[in-house]
Amino acid sequence: PVPKSQLVAEFREARAMLYRGDLNETFCLAVGEAQASGVPAVVGDLGSVVERVRDGETGTIARDDDTFAAAAVALLTDDALWRRQHEAALKARRAWGWPEAAAAFESLIP
């Protein structure tokens, strides 16, 4: 664990969040925090992380190792791609706040 101030500073410097995924992952706060900070994510097609990333918009959902590696390299080397996905991640964060979360939860209750 690191202090929140350090985590924020690390995300400000990050080009990409790389996470292979875990079959038992039910939320993946780390990817959520990265995306909320505007860091595009490259994730494996496994567990709940596929619900956090808008494939091709806020990051990449990689279906295999070659795609995962290529997407990571692309974010590190293609400034225009990084900028688009960075801005999309920030926009997605602003569109989902407590009122939206509460409404989504309430919609599940009959």
Residue ranges and their predicted role:
Residues V8, V31-A36, V50-E51:
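Short alpha-helical segment that forms part of, or immediately flanks, the ligand-binding pocket
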Residues D55-D66, A74-D79:
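Conserved acidic donor-binding segment of nucleotide-sugar-dependent glycosyltransferases
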Residues D79-I109:
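A charged, aromatic-enriched C-terminal amphipathic alpha-helix characteristic of glycosyltransferases
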Residues E25-C28, Q35, D45-L46:
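Short glycine/acidic-rich beta->alpha loop that forms part of the nucleotide-sugar donor binding site
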Residues P40-V43:
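Short hydrophobic beta-strand element within catalytic cores of glycosyltransferases
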